Amino acid sequence: MNKNITVLKGDGIGPEIVDQAIKVLDVICEKYSHKFNYTEVDIGGCSIDKFGVPITEEGMAKCKAADSVLLGAVGGPKWDNVAPSVRPEKALLAVRSELGLFANLRPTKLFPQLADSSPLKPSIVGNGIDLMIVRELTGGIYFGKRRTDTVDGEKVATDEMTYSEHEVERIGRVAFESARKRSGRVASVDKANVLDSSRLWRAVMHKLAEEYPDVEYSDILVDNTAMQLIKNPAQFDVIVTENMFGDILSDEASMLTGSIGMMPSASLSSTTLGMYEPIHGSAPDIAGMDRANPIGTIMSAAMMLRYSFDMADEADAIERAVNKALDDGYRTADIYKDGFVKVGCSEMGTIIASNI
């Protein structure tokens, strides 16, 4: 099978970690008789340096023409003072919007080999952590109208948080369908005791839940969710929520596993086109030092195979290869402890690729 992948290596450690994912994908091609064609596009700070914008129109067109997009990371202190309209992160919002990527899937799974790396007590993580946060990506306060006015001599800033019924319904369907493939439970997170947008969210979710009688459904307020993720994360299967709540909760959930470097994510459209990236940032402090953990990016590539290319066997092979590397005691610096074998970013990629 031939597939075209647009590669956005980005800034900081982005090029290093993406190179390891491609190393693994190349082995998949050899083992399963596929052909992946890679097209590189500058994004973020490196694009600002070259072209004055975080992504060019030509680069965006290449993303839209691809079968899937693989992203490293964007941003860094170097670009903190550029105009807000051309900040590196603006490219991500633009790609999500242009590609219609409305659903962000962030699995949080504690690798048993790393259970002692979790900041939670063994009595909590002993029950296992295997949850999926489904976050709405193209609506809410991040895409609402915003303005700064002067009222009675002082500045007043306003951000609008807007959701329509169809936006809530389509992200809800992603969550319910995901739950059917997992443990069959959906928790919808909102702030319906305060926000009108959350009351609409809850009403639409209740109606949608009637179409999925085989899925156990519950409502939970966002502040209680933040607490329950620490108190008893094993209670959750699929969590679905709006853009800002999902942004915050998914970062909280990522640390339950002990390292943000392990976690992948997928941003999906209504077609098979998606963008796949690790959840961590560009880590400019270790860029170019071969110290980054490529596992989150490699697992993101596995999600790409599963969700965009319908290559479940190939995705399983990557996940088994990652588990074997951990079983064999290999650790990058962020997850290293005495008694294990410390390896660099490139070597970890090579080890995982060789396990396929």
What are these regions (language model features)?
Residues 6-23, 27-29, 151-223, 235:
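Glycine-rich phosphate/diphosphate-binding loop of Rossmann-like nucleotide-binding domains
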Residues 33-57, 227-229:
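N-terminal beta-loop-helix "entrance" segment that forms/cooperates
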Residues 11-14, 67, 134, 175, ...:
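Buried hydrophobic positions in well-ordered alpha/beta secondary-structure cores of metabolic enzymes
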